[in-house]
Regions:
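Transmembrane beta-strands of outer-membrane beta-barrel pores
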Residues: 1, 51-57, 165, 177-183, ...
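Outer membrane beta-barrel
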Residues: 1-76, 80
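Outer-membrane beta-barrel translocator domains and adjoining extracellular loop/strand segments
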Residues: 2-5, 60-66, 186-192, 244-250
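Residues that define the transmembrane beta-barrel architecture of outer-membrane proteins
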Residues: 29-33, 153-157, 213-217, 290-293
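Outer-membrane beta-barrel channels and translocator barrels
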Residues: 30, 42-44, 166-168, 180, ...
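Residues on the lipid-exposed face of transmembrane beta-strands in outer-membrane beta-barrel proteins
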Residues: 34-39, 159-163, 175, 219-223, ...
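Transmembrane beta-strands of outer-membrane beta-barrel proteins
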Residues: 47-49, 171-173, 231-233
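Flexible glycine-rich, low-complexity coil/linker segments exposed to the extracellular/periplasmic environment
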Residues: 66, 74-151, 200-204, 258-290
Length: 293
């Protein structure tokens, strides 16, 4: 059984491997460059230490696959829709997004919209001019996936102390402390760089990042019960565990710069973009997670 978030958080996982029938947990662990050493103090007391000189992320299910949970932060994702169903998607193939959409203020008539794999379909239904206008509006209501914010390779290390208590039913206790960078992706954003009150001007973007320097302290035990039953368990504590904020709140926060133009134009407050994260200046970084115990 694979339980996420335990003491084994130092190991990146290939999630797709766990979907295979008959797969063992060890098959999902990804190799990472590291140094490891151990020392035996007595027959009952030992210590282990490691230092990783390489960081790798957990490989989540790719965009469009059966078990994928989203199509923008997973491998293959290139954009996120900000229109919440009010406009059509600019492309079917996410690899064509950059060639189709100009991040800024795309307008009907720009030749790049013809790069969309949806252009021929929409042009046959509505005509070339309307198809270009629809795709330009779609591009304006989409936020590009910006460069991922990967952590540094250094700064990951840990220590484990193991005690074998023969008098306590031959139980092995483990005590752990380590510092590592997140293997799981978290979502943040960049606020729109323009304040024009039109979906054609949305320049908000999505950032996939991996917070650094997460501290973990853990305890484990391993023993046997009557009847040959193995019993084991663990506890872990993180004083600064990163917790994801709802992605919709991040998107609304990234669109709050447009409120300046909406207010100046006399638009009713009901049309403003409101987020629990507050308001942001154009182009500001919107952190999409909090650190909690």
């Amino acid at each position: 059984t694979f339980l996420q978030g335990g003491i084994n958080a130092i190991n990146p996982i290939d999630v797709s491997r766990l979907r295979v029938a008959g797969a063992e947990i060890k098959e999902a662990f990804l190799p990472v460059g590291s140094f490891w050493g151990s020392m035996q103090f007595t027959d009952a007391l030992s210590m282990e230490a490691f230092y990783q000189y390489e960081w790798k992320n957990t490989e989540i299910d790719p965009s469009g696959t059966y078990f994928a949970t989203n199509d923008f932060a997973s491998p293959g994702g290139s954009y996120v829709m900000l229109g919440f169903g009010t406009v059509t998607q600019p492309v079917w193939n996410p690899d064509l997004f950059d060639d189709t959409c100009i991040i800024g203020a795309p307008t009907a008539g720009q030749t790049n919209v013809t790069n969309s794999d949806r252009y021929a379909e929409l042009a046959a239904l509505y005509g070339p001019a309307t198809a270009a206008a629809l795709l330009a509006q779609s591009c304006g209501a989409a936020g590009a996936r910006l460069a991922d914010n990967d952590p540094r390779d250094s700064g990951q290390f840990g220590l484990a102390l193991r005690w074998f208590a023969e008098n306590l039913n031959q139980t092995e206790f483990g005590f752990y402390a380590m510092n590592y960078h997140s293997r799981l992706p978290l979502l943040s954003g960049r606020a729109a760089t323009t304040i024009l009150p039109t979906p054609l001007a949305n320049t908000a973007g999505l950032i996939v990042e991996y917070p650094e320097d997460i501290q973990l302290y853990g305890f484990s035990f391993n023993t046997s019960l009557p009847g040959g039953i193995a019993w084991q368990g663990e506890l872990s504590y993180r004083p600064n565990a990163p917790m994801q904020i709802d992605d919709v709140e991040i998107l609304f926060a990234a669109l709050t710069p447009i409120n300046q133009a909406l207010q100046a134009g006399g638009a009713p407050p009901a049309t403003y973009f409101v987020s629990q994260l507050g308001s942001y200046n154009p182009g500001a970084y919107v952190r999409g997670y909090t650190e909690n115990q």
